[in-house]
Design a protein with these regions (language model features):
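Active-site-proximal, substrate-binding regions of enzyme catalytic domains
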Residues: 2-220, 227-312, 316, 325, ...
Length: 344
């Protein structure tokens, strides 16, 4: 049965080792864009690995295009986050103070003192936020990540499909999406108004990867941080493997086996198969970046509300700051380490 359904089975350690020694490494745009979300240490570790395998790196034209188009969007989103956090903090501060005002006649709540503590806590957080923003690298003006990738990937980007082939791919893509054939169909709602190039971007990447394997007669290790089920087989919330349909389609088209990893797993496997020494802390950070689609300030603010409505504890200011900083999301870590970046 294994010979008939190889897409459902893991490779042996021997076969896997062979792939890592011979295959081409292909990176999706989301992996390249996530480099902006890593701390300097994690980013350097990733670049060290890219340098080691640079002679076997290749990326699709579509992935390179998406990186170029979205690079400034990602950079700007990080800058805009400071503004968004300030607006959210200001809104919640007003709501908390309004709530306290409704208890002015409460016999035990010292609302005036509580309001002073709240004011002090929010002012302290605002000052910290200002300091972090001032230290944040201005990648809009000077982008060393872009420059480094431009050198590293020179001559390693595939050609685009001709217009006629793209038009056919769009027609085939619509049918695939309607039938929920991976990859990409999960983008239907999100990207339906962004034009065919964006809507069918995952399929373009996929077909360009297949064509590359046909031309060079070598298999591919594809690294993507896409989390959706049109790339990954999931069971009861747990990611089991890449979609078997993708592995089968690749084999049917190329007679070869494709291996697909998310960035953190790629680093783990490189430690095992390429004698890399990426630390567990870096791998965990890369994993956190993949899992954190956006900086979730709302959760911290809700916790702040609960804390402020408690009983006027003398340590409220420090506790409030702790709550805001305790969740080590990827974006927070990127901000926190921005001063380290400027000193390099």
């Amino acid at each position: 049965m294994k010979n008939k359904f190889t897409e459902y089975y893991k490779l042996s350690e021997k076969d896997l080792k062979s792939h890592w020694e011979e295959d081409i490494f292909c990176f999706d745009a989301n992996v390249l864009l996530n480099l902006y979300r890593y701390s300097p240490n994690a980013r350097e570790a990733f670049f060290r690995l890219l340098e080691q395998v640079k002679d076997r790196i290749w990326i699709t034209y579509q992935a390179a295009l998406e990186y170029q188009k979205n690079r400034l969007v990602v950079i700007n989103a990080q800058r805009e986050a400071y503004k968004d956090i300030r607006e959210t903090l200001g809104k919640k501060k007003g709501e908390i103070e309004s709530k306290l005002n409704s208890f002015k006649k409460h016999p035990y709540l010292q609302t005036t003192e509580l309001k002073k503590q709240i004011e002090s806590a929010f002012d302290s957080i605002s000052r910290d936020l200002d300091n972090l923003e001032n230290k944040h690298p201005d990648y809009l003006d000077n982008d060393p990540i872009w420059e480094k990738l431009s050198v590293l990937l020179e001559g390693k980007v595939g050609d685009d499909f001709p217009k006629e082939e793209l038009e056919k791919l769009y027609r085939d893509g619509k049918k695939r999406y309607d039938e929920k054939v991976p990859p990409g169909y999960m983008d239907m709602k999100e990207k339906q108004n962004e034009g065919n190039r964006s809507l069918y971007g995952d399929i373009i990447v996929w077909k360009q990867v297949i064509e590359k394997a046909k031309v060079v007669d070598v298999s591919i290790i594809l690294i993507t941080d896409d989390l959706k089920e049109d790339w990954w087989y999931k069971f009861k919330g747990k990611t089991i493997s890449p979609r078997p349909e993708l592995i089968k389609e690749f084999k049917d088209e190329t007679s070869k086996r494709i291996n697909i990893y998310q960035a953190d797993k790629f680093l783990e496997m490189a430690n095992r198969n390429l004698a890399q020494q990426t630390t567990k802390e870096v791998i965990q950070e890369v994993r956190n970046v993949r899992l954190a689609d956006e900086f979730d300030i709302e959760k911290e603010i809700r916790e702040l509300e609960m804390l402020f409505e408690d009983n006027g504890d003398e340590n409220v200011k420090e506790n409030a700051k702790l709550l805001v900083s305790k969740r080590e999301s990827s974006f927070e870590k990127a901000i926190r380490n921005s001063s380290e970046e400027q000193n390099k």
